[in-house]
Amino acid sequence: MKKQALICALLATVLLPGCSEDGENTPQPTDGRVALEATSGIRMNTRAYDKTWEAGDAIGIYMLNGDATDGNGNRKYTTAQTAENGSFTAAEGQTIYFPVDASQRDFVAYYPYRETLADGNVYTVDVSVQTPQKDIDLMGAAKVEGKDKTDPKVAFVFTHKLVKLDITIKADGTSLTDADLAGTTVSISNQQTAATYNVVTGGDATVTTGTTKEIVLHTDGLKAEGIVLPAASTAGMALTFTVPGLEGQAFHWDVNSAAQSKAFVAGSKYLYTITISKAGVEVSSKVEDWTPGNGGGETGNAE
């Protein structure tokens, strides 16, 4: 199977007061302030949950003077429409303005927005609850440096900070039909569930080491999705498929048994196709959308 990576770049325009959607400037304040104009895209795939921004999606933006926010931290910008190209506007009282003296500032951003962060810039992550997926799809944008009121356009590029699992379940068509698999649940064992991410300094999310848990993934029919934390090793992790139509029989697959699933790499998406028969489970995998996680695909058997 050839290595696959679906490279997409969906742009979302962030419109702040002082700029209209058609690109024509509205009147600026008389005190000489200039409003930030920002665009944002997401590397590889535009959204963790799917390929569109959804109405109500919000990002947080920080304007930095060195390491200080000068009161311009965690400003909220929200989109009112569901579209591949979303327009974002500042919430009331959230507009960021450049200094009137044309001094330079830096900018960072993150998604999804939260009103309150620990110490003002530390985003806490908890993946123990998987629904809705978009609420735990943490993304950060690298710092954009050296902007001022004479050059107010800031382009953010977001990257995924966690790991996506995308699982398709199907019957072998001989001993079982898809109808027999109705209600199948999927879980993954041996998971850390807590992490922190500094939205100002960026970099990787920091996993908080604690007691591991089994996470029940979000299911929709014969599809299952999960967002989990990065892991240097997948040793001890197993996917479990519990089928009510087979008297609750459970099938297990050792994630670490696949050559390219030895680790869960941040920003990677791992796709698994699970074929279930009365004799057992066959697993194949490939990668799409996010940065390649398990290459061109893998196979395995579950018992």
Curated annotation (Swiss-Prot):
UniProt entry keywords in alphabetical sequence: Fimbrium, Signal
Record InterPro entries: Mfa-like_1, Mfa-like_1_N
Subcellular location: Fimbrium
Organism expressing this protein natively: Bacteroides uniformis (strain ATCC 8492 / DSM 6597 / CCUG 4942 / CIP 103695 / JCM 5828 / KCTC 5204 / NCTC 13054 / VPI 0061)
Record CDD domains: BF2867_like_C, BF2867_like_N
Protein name per its UniProtKB record: Putative fimbrium subunit Fim1C
Similarity comment: Belongs to the bacteroidetes fimbrillin superfamily. Mfa-like family.
Keyword Ubl conjugation: no
Main localisation: other
Signal peptide segment: 1-22
Pfam families recorded: Mfa_like_1 (PF13149)
GO CC annotation: pilus
Complexes and interactors: May be part of the fimbrial tip.
Function: Putative component of the fimbrium tip. Fimbriae are filamentous appendages on the cell surface that mediate cell adhesion and biofilm formation.
